């Protein structure tokens, strides 16, 4: 029997906003960090939560998502004040983040602004993207945090606005359900039933080949498009271009 200790930190951030073009974090700041410690699949209660003064205004669109006002942040610490405590908390752990590129991008950007030669997060933490995992488990389905809560029957009724600590706590429950195996049989059977039903009812129509040339997006273009939609959906709660 293995006695190895597995330490995971389920993490979420809220920010002043994001860029639609270029690096999504450039010129923006983290204003809230919420993190939940999980050791050997048990929530320990050793959480990390802080609000941060960004020294810039919160974009109206971002305020509409998380409801964190500029006035509320005026007396909060800046990132430099908490960075050492934060690094001590996450160092060596596996970070579980929904759409990890968003939060890791911001974290590495904030580290870089300090001019302290702090290395990239993925050099001292393993990073697991729960959104990527969900897409592998449920291809073609909605895999936002709210959608996963509904799928796994996890209560998210308190999530009227996005908040980093609440979202991290909810994601911890979702991730444990996704990786715990208790409900995997149900969803596997559900998917197999749907597949079999689909095979029985789909009628295939043979069409004559079209003379029109069809131009497909390259793999790089598709990846860039999906990455941008991920960012929109993570911070907006929904995405018009996804069903």
Curated annotation (Swiss-Prot):
Gene Ontology terms describing biological process: DNA replication proofreading
Entry binding sites for a divalent metal cation 2: 12
Residues reported in the UniProt entry to bind a divalent metal cation 1: 12, 14, 167
Keywords, alphabetical: DNA replication, DNA-directed DNA polymerase, Exonuclease, Hydrolase, Magnesium, Manganese, Metal-binding, Nuclease, Nucleotidyltransferase, Transferase
Active site per UniProt: 162 (proton acceptor)
Assembly behavior: The DNA polymerase holoenzyme is a complex that contains 10 different types of subunits. These subunits are organized into 3 functionally essential subassemblies: the pol III core, the beta sliding clamp processivity factor and the clamp-loading complex. The pol III core (subunits alpha,epsilon and theta) contains the polymerase and the 3'-5' exonuclease proofreading activities. The polymerase is tethered to the template via the sliding clamp processivity factor.
Protein function: DNA polymerase III is a complex, multichain enzyme responsible for most of the replicative synthesis in bacteria. The epsilon subunit contains the editing function and is a proofreading 3'-5' exonuclease.
Name the UniProt record assigns to this protein: DNA polymerase III subunit epsilon
Species this protein is from: Salmonella typhimurium (strain LT2 / SGSC1412 / ATCC 700720)
Gene: dnaQ
């Amino acid at each position: 029997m293995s006695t190895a200790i597995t330490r995971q930190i389920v993490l979420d951030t809220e920010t002043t906003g994001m860029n639609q073009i270029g690096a999504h974090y450039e010129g923006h700041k983290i204003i809230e960090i919420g993190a939940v410690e999980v050791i050997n699949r048990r929530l320990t209660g050793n959480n990390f939560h802080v609000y941060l003064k960004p020294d810039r205004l919160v974009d109206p669109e971002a305020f509409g998502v998380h409801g964190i006002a500029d006035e509320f942040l005026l007396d909060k610490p800046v990132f430099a004040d908490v960075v050492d405590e934060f690094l001590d908390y996450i160092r060596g752990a596996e970070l579980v983040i929904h759409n990890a590129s968003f939060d890791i991008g911001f974290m590495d950007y904030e580290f870089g602004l300090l001019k302290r030669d702090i290395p990239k997060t993925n050099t001292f933490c393993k990073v697991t993207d729960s959104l990527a995992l969900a897409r592998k488990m449920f291809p073609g389905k909605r895999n936002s945090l709210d959608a996963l809560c509904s799928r796994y029957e996890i209560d998210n009724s308190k999530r009227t606005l996005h908040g980093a600590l609440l979202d991290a706590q909810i994601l911890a429950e979702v991730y444990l359900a996704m990786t715990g195996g208790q409900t995997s049989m149900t969803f596997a059977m559900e998917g197999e039933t749907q597949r079999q039903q689909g095979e029985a009812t789909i009628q295939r129509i043979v069409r004559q080949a079209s003379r029109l040339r069809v131009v497909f997006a390259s793999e790089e273009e598709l990846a860039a498009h999906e990455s941008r939609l991920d960012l929109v959906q993570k911070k907006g709660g929904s995405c018009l271009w996804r069903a």
